[in-house]
């Protein structure tokens, strides 16, 4: 019951998943089983070297960036970094989801029938199952989580698939809970991707043949197996040690030197890992802790055991039948750092140092949670919301009463309220920059980046305060000294806030902000090729409503003929910005606003055909 509560899967589903995974060995690419309200898709594993490291991929670990259009959620929202996955595994998925195959139609049928879908596989078939689950989440589930059923992914001895961004994105979207990966203690396959391709390429073909359960039994005297195991674990050790040093901020000098000239594997665990021993099952859902355990659970207690482990690492890859059959007889532990982990890790053969590193990883996650709580406290203690409310409910209305709006009032800063607004602007920036620092250092839980309450607060802050930052930038003539605000002056806090909001509103449609923006621009019929328009709008403020004033400031001093495309783009975006609350129409059309004063200087022919002509009818009539 405890296992099901943690993972969302029961013993029967695990047994059926393993059974389907065995059947997948007999199929071309995948095997489908249907029983009651569940449909299981099991993927055939491959034990060919080219299906672990794509021959055309020249990188040290066979990795490739995911396609952002196909996998829009698999990235860090703020930084914009896209997740990396193993290219060979990705190509296998692409072949399976090709519309010419039966797979997509089978998934569509299961979706329409309102059946729960389980993706599963043994060995590299598990890698395909992981990517297929992400594909399903992006293509179906994210569009309407209240309609589409939650999928499950159950793997047995699967290799690692993606990098830390892959793991982070699953955590942010709260999808990690859908992935359960069973690992026999010494199984080498979940560790292979932590090794450099150059380290194992000579021995990999032979070892993969030994890993194939359809081939002959393991040769205990085979030197190539020992060599392969030693090289994989040597690289795994380097990765694990570097990771824990980065985690705790105690980087050892030799590791810093080593990492400067030696590439380390980008692959990291994702989801829940269930380690199995003779006595117990140990579930871990902390990626950093899992990485340490992948190394420290496979170590020997003495020299005699060490000589046997390389061959045990092959046999354990064949042991999942026994694991599944004995699950009901084993103790179950969830390694979350709350309870004593000594006995649990002892049973897994983890050394004292290993226990310290696993505990350190679990403690770091606790610190991330504490940091999130502190942010909430700071927002409350610093009267964050009251400061925003003062700008919104007092400062803005008073400025608007003077017919010039709060942007222009702040830019001039002649009144006492302008000084107060500047103080509050600086205080609010301090809070946001503190949060941003924690996000950049990965010192907040993965879920924080996608937290709806935080996104809404950051959006309110960006819309309200960024115009003041733009006004301040131009008041001090930084545009002349440093360059345009959009190119040189825009604080990262606003970029992160903008991207978080865009992800939040576009996610249900499986879209990315850049494509949406350029589709809108293309629909404005500006009379140029899209490539020319993209070059013209590079570093413009038309991609974000809170940057409206930055674009106005850049346009107002230039000849119309030089900036016609930018003017029309700004006008074309403005209506939707007003509707969405990005721009305050009560502000920008005021008699004394910088925008209105600039707009009336535009050529009469332009104004007569402008989408803003209804707002500016008196100006058109006067001119």
From Swiss-Prot:
GO biological process, one term: response to hypoxia
General function of this protein: Positive regulator of basal resistance and of effector-triggered immunity specifically mediated by TIR-NB-LRR (TNL) resistance proteins. Disruption by bacterial effector of EDS1-TIR-NB-LRR resistance protein interactions constitutes the first step in resistance activation. Acts redundantly with salicylic acid to regulate resistance gene-mediated signaling. Triggers early plant defenses and hypersensitive response independently of PAD4, and then recruits PAD4 to potentiate plant defenses through the accumulation of salicylic acid.
A single GO cellular-component term on record: nucleus
Modified residues (N-acetylalanine): 2
Gene transcribed to yield this protein: EDS1
Catalytic residues in the record: 123 (nucleophile), 187 (charge relay system), 317 (charge relay system)
Molecular function in Gene Ontology: lipase activity; protein homodimerization activity
Record note on quaternary structure: Homodimer. Interacts with RPS4, RPS6, SNC1, SRFR1, AvrRps4 and HopA1. Part of a nuclear complex made of EDS1, PAD4 and SAG101, that can be redirected to the cytoplasm in the presence of an extranuclear form of EDS1. Interacts (via N-terminus) with PAD4 (via N-terminus). Interacts (via N-terminus) with SAG101. EDS1-SAG101 and EDS1-PAD4 form separate complexes in pathogen-unchallenged cells. Part of a nuclear protein complex made of VICTR, PAD4 and EDS1. Interacts with VICTR.
InterPro entries: AB_hydrolase_fold, EDS1-like, EDS1_EP, Fungal_lipase-type
Keyword field: Acetylation, Coiled coil, Cytoplasm, Endoplasmic reticulum, Hydrolase, Microsome, Nucleus, Plant defense
Protein name: Protein EDS1
Gene3D superfamilies assigned: alpha/beta hydrolase
């Amino acid at each position: 019951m405890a296992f099901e509560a943690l993972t969302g899967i029961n013993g029967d589903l695990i047994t059926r998943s393993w059974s389907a995974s065995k059947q997948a060995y007999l199929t071309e690419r995948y095997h489908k089983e249907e029983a009651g309200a569940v449909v299981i898709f099991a993927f055939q594993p491959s034990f060919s070297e080219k299906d672990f490291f794509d021959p055309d991929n020249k990188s040290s670990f066979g990795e490739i960036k995911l396609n952002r259009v196909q996998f829009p959620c698999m990235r860090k929202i703020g930084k914009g970094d896209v997740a990396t996955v193993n290219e060979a595994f990705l190509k296998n998925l692409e072949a399976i989801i090709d519309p010419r195959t039966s797979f997509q139609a089978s998934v569509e049928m299961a979706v329409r029938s309102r059946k729960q879908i389980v993706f599963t596989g043994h060995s590299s078939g598990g890698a395909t199952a992981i990517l297929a689950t992400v594909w399903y989440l992006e293509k179906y589930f994210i569009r309407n989580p209240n309609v589409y059923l939650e999928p499950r992914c159950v793997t047995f001895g699967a290799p690692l698939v993606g990098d830390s961004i892959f793991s982070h994105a699953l955590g942010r979207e709260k999808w990690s809970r859908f992935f359960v990966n069973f690992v026999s203690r010494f199984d080498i396959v979940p560790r292979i991707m932590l090794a450099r391709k150059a380290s194992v390429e000579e021995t990999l073909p032979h070892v993969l043949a030994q890993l194939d359960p359809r081939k002959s039994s393991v040769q205990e005297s085979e030197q190539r197996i020992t060599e392969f195991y030693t090289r994989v674990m040597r690289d795994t050790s380097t990765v694990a040690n570097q990771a824990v040093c980065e985690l705790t901020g105690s980087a050892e000098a030799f590791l810093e030197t080593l990492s400067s000239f030696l590439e380390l594997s980008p692959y990291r665990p994702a989801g829940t890992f269930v380690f199995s021993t003779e006595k117990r099952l140990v579930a871990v859902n902390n990626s950093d802790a899992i990485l340490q355990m992948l190394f420290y659970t496979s170590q020997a207690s003495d020299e005699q055991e060490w000589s046997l482990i390389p061959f045990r690492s092959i046999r354990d890859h064949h042991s999942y039948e026994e694991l599944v059959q004995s699950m009901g007889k084993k103790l179950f532990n969830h390694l979350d750092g709350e309870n004593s982990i000594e006995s649990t890790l002892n049973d897994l053969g983890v050394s004292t140092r290993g226990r310290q590193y696993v505990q350190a990883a679990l403690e770091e996650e606790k610190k991330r949670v504490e940091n999130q709580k502190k942010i909430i406290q700071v927002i409350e203690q610093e009267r964050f919301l009251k400061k925003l409310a003062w700008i919104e409910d007092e400062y803005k209305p008073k400025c608007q009463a003077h017919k010039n709006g709060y942007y222009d009032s702040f830019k001039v800063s002649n009144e006492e309220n302008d000084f107060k607004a500047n103080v509050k602007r600086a205080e609010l920036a301090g809070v946001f920059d503190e949060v941003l620092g924690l996000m950049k250092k990965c010192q907040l839980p993965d879920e924080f980046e996608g937290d709806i309450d935080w996104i809404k607060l950051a959006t309110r802050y960006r819309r309200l305060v960024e115009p003041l930052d733009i006004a301040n930038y131009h008041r001090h003539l930084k545009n002349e000294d440093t360059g345009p605000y959009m190119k040189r002056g825009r604080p990262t806090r606003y970029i992160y806030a903008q991207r978080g909001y865009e992800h939040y509103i576009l996610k249900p449609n499986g879209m990315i902000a850049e494509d949406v923006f350029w589709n809108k621009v293309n629909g404005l019929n500006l009379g140029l090729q899209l490539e020319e328009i993209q070059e013209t709008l590079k570093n413009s403020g038309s991609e974000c409503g809170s940057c409206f004033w930055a674009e106005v400031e850049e346009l107002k001093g230039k000849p119309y003929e030089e900036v016609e495309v930018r003017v029309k783009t700004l006008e074309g975006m403005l209506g939707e910005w007003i509707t969405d609350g990005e721009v305050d129409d009560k502000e920008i059309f005021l008699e004394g606003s910088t925008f209105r004063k600039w707009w009336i200087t535009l050529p009469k022919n332009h104004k007569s055909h402008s989408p803003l002509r209804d707002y500016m009818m008196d100006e058109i009539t006067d001119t």
